[in-house]
Curated annotation (Swiss-Prot):
Binds 2 [4Fe-4S] clusters. One cluster is coordinated with 3 cysteines and an exchangeable S-adenosyl-L-methionine. Residues 433-496 form the TRAM domain. Monomer. Residues 48-165 form the MTTase N-terminal domain. This is tRNA-2-methylthio-N(6)-dimethylallyladenosine synthase. GO terms for cellular component: cytosol. [4Fe-4S] cluster 2 binds at residues 202, 206, 209. It comes from Xylella fastidiosa (strain 9a5c).
Length: 497
């Protein structure tokens, strides 16, 4: 196991992905929803304005986009960036940490005044806080009109109508399996990169985590449904697919058995993530595939083989380890040891030696000793993690870990966190510096936010790159020669042979 990641370079060779399955054609009965703000002869006149505030993970970003799709399509609402002019205000919440949850009620308090402005403003709370708190939100903030969970966002039009007709708050936080995907409008692209949710929930029940209680057990979307959504996105110019799930590599998508005989045996009853990735790679226009977030327990040999065989699979893996101490990992109920985690990384680097590995770390879990923390630091040195996320443990009510005694002073936790972040940032900065002079494949996403005269995109290892270039390059994969490494991004120039 090496202590530092190798640098991804242009032109790596992988075996061609085998042709496996015919791709489904887009459902002709679906209608394409126009992008809000773009003129469309099929869209009725706006019946009001919609504001959505999103907290939390990429799954929440995806769900917020689906809320917008539902309400702009079925209710003819127009998206706005200004809550003060909105007729419907939604906040999509996160409950992973206590601080994030309290932000929700602070935000709701600021919006309360809009209810007394003389307009019939509807305020809704969605996401994981909604699932966890339910009707308690309305009791604490009686001016809230809607409370809905991640699995019931497709019911927003009905909830809005019921609120107006019955003049009382509506709460729906059930877990109706995967039903919501059957009621969502056709996906629409908002750039060359798109998120696609392939599963919901988590069944691992880590002792510190609320996700199984707020998003339910693991439920996978059918294999063909996922490919149909990607087919729609591909026709709209999407070049990069980001597969989403709370435990995305636990994906088990049901497959249509179809006819079988001696020459054409029946496919397996379900597709795992490795098989799904191979199928997505058959779309000629999809040049890059990513997935997040993963659990080490589900990091299978099938997925390692996909990294070996599928060049479109990005040369980056985010695999949350949380701790390097076996004692703490056991208390977290993670189901693996530090050695088993390193073994999985060793297998992956055997087929992708230059892959970038990022992770998540929880510092100050109840009972964490100096020895436990030093084992985490040793794991960081052994793996050579790239850019990663790290947080001080946040006690969440209802989780098993919330009952554990914790005698570690907050100051020690903060010192440990700073020490860990300093080391990971040093590794990440070293990787960025060693990318100078290399040629990286970049998907051009659009104009740079800091300089609209430049373009921006991301490398395979998730580093933003800013460079001069013509707008016609947007949406294309191009080679960029890296010339400078900054603290949070790279600079470069278009590479010409």
């Amino acid at each position: 196991m090496t202590g530092t990641s190798n640098i991804p370079t242009h032109g790596k060779e992988h075996k061609d992905a085998p042709a496996l399955l015919p791709l489904p054609a887009p459902n002709p009965h679906h209608t394409h929803a126009a992008h809000p703000g773009n003129p469309s002869h099929d869209r009725p006149p706006s019946r009001g304005k919609l504001f959505i505030k999103t907290h939390g993970c990429q799954m929440n970003e995806y769900d917020s986009a689906k809320m917008a799709d539902v309400l702009t399509t079925t209710e003819a609402l127009e998206l706005t960036d200004n809550p003060e002019e909105a007729d419907i205000i939604l906040i999509n919440t996160c409950s992973i940490r206590e601080k994030a949850q309290e932000k929700v009620f602070s935000q709701l308090g600021r919006w309360r005044a809009l209810k007394t402005s003389g307009r019939d403003v509807i305020i809704g709370v969605g996401g994981c806080v909604a699932s966890q708190e339910g009707e308690a939100i309305v009791k604490r903030a009686p001016y809230v009109d809607l409370v809905f969970g991640p699995q019931t966002l497709h019911r927003l039009p009905d909830m809005i109508r019921a609120r107006r007709e019955q003049n009382r708050p509506q709460v729906d936080i059930r877990f109706p399996e995967i039903e919501k995907f059957d009621h969502l409008p056709t996906p629409r692209a908002e750039g060359p990169s798109a998120f696609v949710s392939i599963m919901e929930g988590c069944s691992k029940y880590c002792s510190f985590c609320v996700v199984p209680y707020t998003r339910g057990e693991e439920v996978s979307r059918p294999f063909e449904d996922v490919l149909t959504e990607i087919a729609h996105l591909a026709t709209q110019g999407v070049r990069e697919i980001n597969l989403l799930g709370q435990n995305v590599n636990a994906y088990r998508g049901a497959m249509d058995p179809g006819p079988s005989n001696n020459t054409n045996p029946a496919p397996p009853p379900y597709a795992d993530l490795g098989l799904l990735i191979r199928a997505i790679a058959q779309f000629e226009s999809i040049g890059r595939i990513r997935f997040t977030t993963s659990h080490p327990l589900e990091f299978s040999d099938s997925l390692v083989e996909a990294y070996r065989d599928v060049p479109q699979l990005a040369n980056h893996l985010h695999l949350p380890v949380q701790s390097g101490s076996d004692r703490i990992l056991s208390a977290m109920k993670r189901g693996y040891t530090a050695l088993e985690f390193k073994s999985k990384i060793r297998k992956l680097r055997a087929v992708r030696p230059d892959i970038s590995i990022s992770s998540d770390f929880i510092i100050g879990f109840p009972g964490e000793s100096d020895t436990d923390f030093q084992k985490t630091m040793q794991l960081i040195e052994d793996i050579g993690f790239d850019q990663s996320f790290s947080f001080i443990y946040s006690r969440r009510p209802g989780t098993p870990a919330s009952n554990l005694e914790d005698h570690t002073p907050d100051e020690i936790k903060r010192t440990r966190l700073e020490h860990l972040q300093k080391h990971i940032n040093t590794y990440a900065a070293d990787i960025s510096k060693r990318m100078i002079g290399t040629v990286q494949t970049v998907l051009v996403e659009g104009p740079s936010k800091k300089n609209p005269n430049e373009l921006t995109g991301k490398t395979e290892n998730m580093r933003p790159v800013n460079f001069p270039g013509h707008p016609r390059l947007i949406g294309q994969f191009i080679d960029v020669h890296i010339t400078e490494a900054l603290s949070n991004s790279l600079r470069g120039r278009v590479h010409t042979n």
